[in-house]
């Protein structure tokens, strides 16, 4: 009996530790193939954010209690972040965008660190945090690039393009290249950190499946939060840079 319990426990731990990279479960939607496992975990993240938002704000009180405290703290945190990075005149309209980015990335990262997605079986590949897929992080980075282009162009019109030859015309190639490196750095930084964290935890659980991986998992929670903050902060900084006046 003891041997059976030990074997079943070991099998469960190894199932948790199993890591498969580059394998995807595809859904066919019309002519397009999409990563089904990313959509499933993304819907879970959206549901968590929606449930917490509704639960925390359905019965607002003058003196906040419970989840209302949490939602107000998050709102103030994102508002201060936007104000710091974008400036007092323009920051208000960008709070929803930065807040959505931060919450989606934060909950996605923490879902990968806290939920043993690997034990849920799908026909191919495995479930993981949405930000563990390069397609998700690239999409978030391109969305950020679109946002700061829109911010600059909507405020300055064609004058926005003067930034490419400022302070000197010979800097044009460097400034153009910078617009390509920004989304690259955003996407690969987030993807690399989340993937590396899940791989390290998976390997440690396979090698030493008791208490040794726990500090790494706790560090992963901290890193996951930092990555969400870094992404949202850089997004705000890029938007602020695109709308500031160059002299």
Curated annotation (Swiss-Prot):
Subcellular location: Plastid, Chloroplast thylakoid membrane
Disulfide cysteine pairs (residue numbers): none
Transmembrane segments: 36-56, 95-115, 134-154, 199-219, 220-240
PROSITE patterns: ATPASE_A (PS00449)
SUPFAM superfamilies from the UniProt entry: F1F0 ATP synthase subunit A (SSF81336)
Keywords of the record: ATP synthesis, CF(0), Chloroplast, Hydrogen ion transport, Ion transport, Membrane, Plastid, Thylakoid, Transmembrane, Transmembrane helix, Transport
Highest taxon above the source species: Eukaryota
Membrane topology: Multi-pass membrane protein
One of the record's GO cellular component terms: chloroplast thylakoid membrane
GO molecular function: proton-transporting ATP synthase activity, rotational mechanism
Family the UniProt entry places it in: Belongs to the ATPase A chain family.
Primary role: Key component of the proton channel; it plays a direct role in the translocation of protons across the membrane.
Quaternary structure (record): F-type ATPases have 2 components, CF(1) - the catalytic core - and CF(0) - the membrane proton channel. CF(1) has five subunits: alpha(3), beta(3), gamma(1), delta(1), epsilon(1). CF(0) has four main subunits: a, b, b' and c.
Name of the featured protein: ATP synthase subunit a, chloroplastic
């Amino acid at each position: 009996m003891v041997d059976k319990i030990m074997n079943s426990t070991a099998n469960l731990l190894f199932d948790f530790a199993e890591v498969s990279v580059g394998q995807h479960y595809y859904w066919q939607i019309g002519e397009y193939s999409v990563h089904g496992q990313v959509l499933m975990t993304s819907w879970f993240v959206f549901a968590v954010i929606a449930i917490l938002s509704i639960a925390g704000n359905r019965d607002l009180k003058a003196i906040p209690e419970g989840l209302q405290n949490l939602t107000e703290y998050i709102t103030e945190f994102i508002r201060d972040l936007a104000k710091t990075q974008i400036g007092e005149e323009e920051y208000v309209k960008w709070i929803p965008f930065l807040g959505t980015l931060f919450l989606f990335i934060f909950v996605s990262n923490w879902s990968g660190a806290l939920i043993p997605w690997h034990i849920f079986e799908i026909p191919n590949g495995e479930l993981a945090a949405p930000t563990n897929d390069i397609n998700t992080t690239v999409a978030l980075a391109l969305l950020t690039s679109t946002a700061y282009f829109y911010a600059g162009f909507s405020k300055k019109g064609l004058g926005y393009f003067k930034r490419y030859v400022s302070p000197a015309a010979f800097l044009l190639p460097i400034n153009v290249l910078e617009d390509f490196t920004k989304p690259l750095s955003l996407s690969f930084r987030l993807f690399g950190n989340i993937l590396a964290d899940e791989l390290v935890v998976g390997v440690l659980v396979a090698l030493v499946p008791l208490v040794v991986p726990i500090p790494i998992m706790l560090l992963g929670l901290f890193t996951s939060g930092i990555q969400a903050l870094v992404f949202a902060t850089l997004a705000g900084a890029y938007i602020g840079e695109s709308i500031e006046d160059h002299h």
